């Protein structure tokens, strides 16, 4: 058996599931995904519109399937749906062993609803159900954004017995609403007679984008006190989120009642963990966010950085809430408008995915056009 990288093995042993934030047909065909499972402790995959847009734009792995779909008269939406769900289904199959070995906790692959639906609850629910049926794998996660319209969709989709990855969470306040939506969904699933032990969920809390936005504002404010806070907000925010998770799932009565009927915790997932600022350690959002019952989904570059020089020191999150709160108190004191930061980040997050989806549609249209000539 191939040996696992010791740094990533230490991360896994500390309770962090390592997931790959990427997927492409080339990665599946070459056996690279299986190799990462065997050597880099990868036990899950996340995708998003930007990842698929990049996969479509690079190389020719999709050419023959798109030509076949063009010959059948498939439109752009149908083509994207077929191609992306095929990749996700194949990735689910590659990760079946990890899914079985973890009793369904890991071995998960996430596919996102069309980001253009982020403001439409009913259409989000309908597409989530449709994607679940098309992929037809028990280790699938449907990604739903934590927008105001997304929250009731999360509850409704979980109530159908469908596992959900809640994405685009930036603030602890919104994260609390997400946990509430999860518990409401599980209560409804119980009423409907679903086996709660088979319904899983993660809450994807974005990290590096918080630093990018807040650092920009700190530089504008200027002065020693403000500048000293750069690079601290992302980790502090995630640590406060973990404290909220512990409050709800380790001490909360509402969850305990569901747990008695087999419900799992909704694990926090650290997303956007690739470091954007070259002044910071490229493993910052991994080594500083080690905690039991968490997931860290990373681009391959970050996985490689952790494998090469990541120092895993055990749990770096539990008990850090008061220090993290001090960072936020200080940010407010120097004049950072935190509520505005989180509104901007959510809007930008949705816009980025919509832009990627638009590019994906344009690329697909171009390929369908070429194939039908």
Swiss-Prot record:
HAMAP family: Transaldolase_2 (MF_00493). This is Transaldolase. Transaldolase is important for the balance of metabolites in the pentose-phosphate pathway. It is an enzyme of class 2 (transferase). It comes from Mycolicibacterium paratuberculosis (strain ATCC BAA-968 / K-10) (Mycobacterium paratuberculosis). GO terms for biological process: carbohydrate metabolic process; pentose-phosphate shunt. Keywords: Cytoplasm, Pentose shunt, Schiff base, Transferase. It holds the Pfam family TAL_FSA. It catalyses: D-sedoheptulose 7-phosphate + D-glyceraldehyde 3-phosphate = D-erythrose 4-phosphate + beta-D-fructose 6-phosphate. One of its GO terms (molecular function) is transaldolase activity. The active site is at residue 143. It is found in: Cytoplasm. The keyword Transferase applies. Its EC number is 2.2.1.2.
């Amino acid at each position: 058996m191939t040996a696992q990288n010791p740094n990533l093995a230490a991360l896994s042993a500390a309770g962090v599931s390592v997931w790959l934030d990427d997927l492409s047909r080339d990665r599946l065909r070459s056996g690279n995904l299986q190799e990462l499972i065997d050597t880099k402790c990868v036990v899950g995959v996340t995708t998003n519109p930007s990842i698929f847009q990049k996969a479509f734009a690079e190389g020719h792995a999709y050419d023959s399937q798109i030509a076949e779909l063009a010959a059948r008269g498939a439109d752009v939406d149908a083509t994207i749906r077929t191609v992306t769900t095929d990749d996700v289904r194949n990735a689910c199959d590659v990760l079946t062993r990890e899914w079985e070995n973890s009793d369904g906790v890991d071995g998960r692959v996430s596919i996102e609803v069309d980001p253009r639906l982020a403001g439409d609850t009913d259409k989000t629910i309908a597409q989530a159900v449709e994607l679940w049926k098309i992929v037809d794998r028990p280790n699938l996660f449907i990604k739903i954004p934590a927008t105001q319209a997304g929250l009731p969709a999360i509850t409704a989709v979980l109530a159908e017995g469908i596992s959900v990855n809640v994405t685009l969470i930036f603030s602890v306040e919104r994260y609390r609403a997400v946990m509430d939506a999860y518990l409401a969904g599980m209560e409804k699933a119980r009423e409907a007679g679903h086996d709660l032990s088979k319904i899983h969920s993660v809450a994807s809390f974005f990290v590096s984008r918080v630093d990018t936005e807040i650092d920009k504002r700190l530089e504008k404010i200027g002065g020693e006190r403000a500048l000293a806070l750069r690079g601290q907000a992302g980790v502090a925010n995630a640590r406060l989120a973990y404290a909220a998770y512990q409050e709800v799932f380790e001490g909360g009565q509402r969850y305990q009642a569901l747990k008695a009927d087999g419900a799992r915790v909704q694990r926090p997932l650290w997303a956007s963990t690739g470091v954007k600022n070259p002044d910071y350690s490229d493993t910052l959002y991994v080594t500083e966010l080690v905690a039991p019952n968490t997931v860290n989904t990373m681009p391959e570059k970050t996985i490689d950085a952790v494998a090469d020089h990541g120092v895993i020191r055990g749990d770096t999150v539990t008990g850090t809430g008061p220090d993290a709160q001090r960072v936020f108190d200080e940010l407010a004191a120097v004049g950072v408008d935190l509520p505005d930061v989180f509104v901007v980040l959510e809007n930008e997050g949705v816009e980025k995915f919509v832009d990627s989806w638009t590019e994906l549609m344009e690329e697909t249209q171009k390929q369908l056009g070429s194939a039908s000539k």
